[in-house]
């Protein structure tokens, strides 16, 4: 029985599974979003969030080397520490989001999903007012008889 066994095996050897997660995490940090199966997206999400937390804590040689043990390309590690980490400096967690897709993969009918970095494709919903609201724009209540 497989009770209390965490993680998915994906019918791969441990080294192949580890390399799969490394490649998915590297591609996610490089492109900002990837389309994959739902199971792989759920498995790579905590893996990626731990790496982003390393970069969020700031650049030092130890954190950079720890990130390089996970990522497969050095330029992605530089981008992680220079762009992605500072972007999430004030965010306490939840750097990625998984969207389930309605379509399934044609060959084996597996559920597909998009995993993306939060804030990668979002635009601010409110305009940024530099000077604040002026008194002329606040609504006036008419007092009449």
What are these regions (language model features)?
Residues 1-19, 23-145:
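Structured, basic alpha/beta domains of bacterial-type, RNA-associated proteins
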